[in-house]
Amino acid sequence: MFGASNNEELKNVIKNGALLIDVRTPSEFADGSVKGAINIPVDSIEKQINKIKNKNNIVVFCRSGARSALAKRILEQNGFKNVVNGKTKNNVNTCLVEV
């Protein structure tokens, strides 16, 4: 289930209280994000692992899906198992509204 790009699965993860992480830059995040999301830029995600180490389900997203794919890979390499690439901010927002 985790890691699939299917929006139904993404909606289920969000419904079950996943941590939403916007991996864009702080300035992009300041211009608007997803309600309830935290900002951890992809280039500093490894340094901030301790902030999220106790989270079971995580959704990462960005502007195009490229940085979130990288963030997902980094988190998985650091032992996280339930990481979903939500791809874009707009995609996650759409799924959040539909939950």
Task: Please report, for each region that a protein language model flagged, where it lies by residue.
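Rhodanese-like catalytic fold shared by cysteine-dependent sulfurtransferases
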Residues: 1-19, 26-57, 66-99
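Short, surface-exposed ligand- or partner-binding patches at beta-edge/loop junctions that are enriched
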Residues: 61
